[in-house]
Amino acid sequence: MPRYCAAICCKNRRGRNNKERKLSFYPFPLHDKERLEKWLKNMKRDSWVPSKYQFLCSDHFTPDSLDIRWGIRYLKQTAIPTIFALPEDNQEKDPSKKKSQKKKLKSEKEVCLKAKSEESFASNEPKKHPVNTDLLPEHAELLESSALVKPPDPKAESVQNNILTLSLVKQGTRKPESILETSVNQDMGIGGFHTSFENLSSTTITLTTASSEGIQQPLETQEVIEITTNHLANPHFTNNSVEIKSAQENPFILSTVTQTVEELNTDKESVIAIFVPTENSKPAINSFIPAPKTVEMEEDIDIEDSYKDVDYETEVLQIEHSYCRQDVNKEHLWQKVSKLHSKITLLELQEQQTLGRLKSLEALIRQLKQENWLSEENVKIIENHFTTYEVTMI
């Protein structure tokens, strides 16, 4: 199992470091609370609780805190890591601060987009388009409805037609209660809008169209349609007069379909703003199409890296558990081996000589016993000679 360094700014991992530079990983002192607090304080992660599967690499320890025995580096029991990156680097790499920065950037982009849209409305001259709508059912409840928008398909004709279909579906049912169809023509003209409602309140809906696959497309030209309806005083039957204004804008990115129902008031006028892309919009070819090929390539690279990691881990194990230093030449080692062999042969010769002397002395003692030339004094002298000889031999 590969080991990673638990420090925030450290990317050391067993198997991916330089072969020239040895790395060793040490677990946290979970049983020694005082020492663990010092470790976490130096790491500037006081509230973090490490597990037994997390380690620190040897780069964070001074050479005094490591004990080298037989070519293996052991961590002393009083060692404390002191070498860490600056706090500014940690703040830059803090994920929570990254998220807050991303949120700020998104909000700034939204503000810029709104400002651009307002400038485009003010600068461009409006075009009038006719819109015909029919609301079929009676007593439709807008509070329980949700709007579904289908983006239009462009046609290669001299007259550009864009059709939007809005279906209001009641929650809990599958049948649409009302269908609103708007046809937008780019020919200049004045359009009238007449609808029949029964006991309906006015609404404000803002709709933006985007690709159904979720791919962001830059729209070089875009039509913005604004519909304003004015209610009459008749409580049972209302006629709404509608004006449609469209303006072409510079490249503008629409990423989501937003549908909001803001107000429900019979006394106030309602506004419906619809953003419609024209035929001149050129969808950008994004890099999501060749996704399976990139996935296969990444899988092959990961497999090759795993094999390399296994080979390198075996090499690291052999180096860590070897009983000689790697900077010694082979010739020097062979010289040491030959010297040891010569010493062994000398010891064997000395052993043979001592055995021969002992055998000769034993034969002499037997001969003296047979001839009865031995006395107590002579025996003591011989025993003393044997003891001194054995001591010198040892």
From Swiss-Prot:
Q: Where are the zinc fingers (THAP-type)?
A: 1-84
**Cellular component terms per the entry's GO annotation:** nucleus
Tell me what PTMs the record reports for this protein.
Cleaved by HTRA2 during apoptosis.
Entry GO MF terms = DNA binding; zinc ion binding
Mainly resides where? nucleus
- Any idea which UniProt keywords this protein has? Cell cycle, Coiled coil, DNA-binding, Metal-binding, Nucleus, Repressor, Transcription, Transcription regulation, Zinc, Zinc-finger
Give the matching InterPro entries.
THAP_domain_protein, THAP_Znf
Q: Which residues form a coiled coil?
A: 347-381
Q: Where in the cell is it found?
A: Nucleus
* HCFC1-binding motif (HBM), short sequence motif: residues: 320-323
Cite the residue spans of the region called Disordered: 86-109
Cysteine pairs bridged by disulfides in the record: none
Record-level GO BP terms: negative regulation of cell cycle
- Highest taxon in the source lineage: Eukaryota
Its quaternary structure? Interacts with HTRA2; under apoptotic conditions. Interacts with ABRAXAS2.
Q: What job does the chain carry out? A: Has sequence-specific DNA-binding activity and can function as transcriptional repressor (in vitro). May be a regulator of cell cycle: THAP5 overexpression in human cell lines causes cell cycle arrest at G2/M phase.
Q: What protein name is recorded for this chain?
A: THAP domain-containing protein 5
The scientific name of the source species is Bos taurus
